[in-house]
Amino acid sequence: KTILTAALLCAFLGTQAQEYYEKHVAFPAGATTEQKIDMASRLVPTPQQLAWQQMEFTCFLHFGINTFTGREWGDGKEDPAIFNPTELDCEQWVRALKEGGFKMAIITAKHHDGFCLWPTRTTKHSVTSSPWKNGKGDVVQELRKACDKYGLKFGVYLSPWDRNAECYGQGEAYNKFFIEQLTELLTNYGEVHEVWFDGANGEGPNGKKQEYDWDAILKTIRRLQPKAVTAIMGDDVRWVGNEGGLGRTTEWSATALMPN
């Protein structure tokens, strides 16, 4: 009786596993609308996606050299000497977020201007060339420690578009440069819960555009921070569709997948 019960349970679980699709579902050729609706209704999130949805309240902190130029997008020609946030207090930021009910803070570690808020080895267009803390400062580290102190999760935004890097637009050379920056962020700052990329793809200082190696980029994240969700250009969290601050009344989480 015990063996039979166990066998029936295994059979039941096997059936259940076949009925649900995690993260992605690919419709077979010739599937009817009804079949597609049925399959889509059995699409479930990964544990990381579910945990992300349950947080509900994340703060995206836009801070960088543009804070000192008053521009939305920098051109990569900024003098690092203007970056000198002598009164920076990441604990004050995170304490306010905690009191406001936020569950995670994401920092613009590098925006389109290419200026890095951490002491990267990849470029001089960073905090190391600024007067702030005599070039020894690290905004990413200060925010990371503040998040740890107040119990918030931590994420990073890294702009694929770089208007300062000379290798931008040179294919493999820039992809290697970008992945090196990403690797620094994912290995030197403890657990990273979200990695946020947009699809910005303007011209670099050489007038060229870059073809990003998203496959290699996402593999790097999965290898170094397997629990992190990837947002917008990743395959865990998609863009809401506008920058107005509000999504549609009904905003489904399903993402269209184009099979190879």
Model-derived segments and their meaning:
Residues A17-N260:
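Mature catalytic domains of secreted/periplasmic carbohydrate-active enzymes
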